[in-house]
Each structure stands twice: as structure tokens, then as C-alpha cells.
From Swiss-Prot:
InterPro entries on file: Ribosomal_uL22, Ribosomal_uL22_bac/org-type, Ribosomal_uL22_sf
Family membership: Belongs to the universal ribosomal protein uL22 family.
Protein name: Large ribosomal subunit protein uL22m
Record note on quaternary structure: Component of the mitochondrial ribosome large subunit (39S) which comprises a 16S rRNA and about 50 distinct proteins.
Annotated source species: Xenopus tropicalis
Compartment annotation: Mitochondrion
Length: 204
């Protein structure tokens, strides 16, 4: 008896949900206006920046390539560790590191790096595809999808299908040398200086 009542209630709830979705009262899954997708959209638009002509005595401006992949079925936190691993490496060294990493995100990041390397040669006038290094590499939260997780006794919960975005910036030239890590005293001194250099809005 209790099982039949639970089944009828569950069926009624599903009918109400379908009716609301069809009538437009609930937001559709294709509509997404968060700042996360806005950032991923603006990232590749940086490739369209046109700089003014340089003077003959100025050093040549290195080429910059912005590339990303959106809605990767992977956790942004797991992707962050891999993104931090290759930051500051040459592109060949980064691809070699990801080649021998057995994580799922490493294979995806390797594909993104190869795509960015190909874009640099085809669209950004880079002569040698190996003459690039990873200037920026980070992950960000994607659009999560909510789904029903079924429990016992006719109950249910809401779970998230996790997605992430991955962003990379390649710059032409050799990688910059790594800086010496700051000591605790230097970090504290820099922090105090930042506090002292603050400005009060609408102040004298």
C-alpha cells in the first residue's frame, strides 16, 4: 500500500515538473548567463587584439596565443594541479610531462596544447612551433548540471555533474627563468607595503 502511494506521488511530481519545464516557468538547461562562460568567451577574443606598428629600433613583440577548452567532464580542482605543473615550461617540455601522466586531465591538456601550438603557426606568424612557452595555465568552474540521485524509501537528492574549463596562453620565445621563492619575512614585508599603499575611495 505504501509503495503504491509513493509511486503515485512520485509520478505526480514528475508530471508537474514536465509541465513547468514545457511552459517555460523553469529555466531551460541551454540558457546560462553566469560570468564563468563570459570569461571563457572573452579569453579567445584576445587573439583578435591588433597592436600598433612598432618602430624599427624597438625589439620585436613576441606572439601570444590564447586558447581554451570548455565544458570538460572533469573536476576543476584536479585539473588545477596539472595546470600548475606545466606553468612556465616550454611547450615541448609540457607536452612531454603530460604524455607520461596517467591522469584523465593530462590527456585533455595535451590535446589543448597541441591545438594552441598549431594555431600559433597558422594564425600568429610563429616560425618555429617549439619556440613557445606556457605563460598562463589555469582551470575554472564550468556549468554544472543538476541531476537526481535516488535513495531508498522513495527519497531522492540532488547531485551535480561537474564540468570545468581549461585556459592556456602560449608566448613566443624561451621560458623566463624561475624566480627565487620569497622568505617569510619578505612576504610579510610585501604584505605590509600593500596595506600601506591602499587608497581610500572618496577620501582626501
Amino acid at each position: 500500500m505504501a509503495a503504491s502511494i509513493t509511486a503515485s506521488v512520485w509520478g505526480t511530481l514528475l508530471k508537474i515538473h514536465r509541465g513547468l519545464t514545457a511552459s517555460g516557468c523553469l529555466p531551460q538547461s541551454c540558457v546560462h548567463t553566469s560570468a564563468v562562460l563570459e570569461r571563457s568567451r572573452h579569453w579567445e577574443m584576445k587573439n583578435r587584439i591588433v597592436y600598433p606598428p612598432q618602430l624599427p629600433d624597438e625589439p620585436r613583440r613576441p606572439a601570444e596565443v590564447y586558447h581554451c577548452r570548455k565544458q570538460i567532464k572533469y573536476s576543476k580542482d584536479k585539473m588545477w594541479y596539472l595546470a600548475k605543473l606545466i606553468r612556465g615550461m616550454s611547450v615541448d617540455q609540457a607536452i612531454a610531462q603530460l604524455e607520461f601522466n596517467d591522469k584523465k586531465g593530462a590527456k585533455i591538456m595535451k590535446e589543448v596544447l597541441l591545438e594552441a601550438q598549431d594555431l600559433a603557426v597558422r594564425n600568429h606568424n610563429v616560425e618555429f612551433k617549439s619556440n613557445l612557452y606556457v605563460a598562463e595555465s589555469f582551470s575554472n568552474k564550468g556549468k554544472y548540471l543538476k541531476r537526481i540521485r535516488y535513495h531508498g524509501r522513495g527519497m531522492f537528492g540532488i547531485m551535480d555533474k561537474v564540468y570545468c574549463h581549461y585556459f592556456v596562453k602560449l608566448v613566443e620565445g624561451p621560458p623566463s627563468p624561475k624566480e627565487e621563492p620569497m622568505t617569510g619575512f619578505q612576504q610579510a614585508k610585501e604584505y605590509v607595503q600593500q596595506l600601506r599603499s591602499r587608497t581610500i575611495t572618496h577620501g582626501l
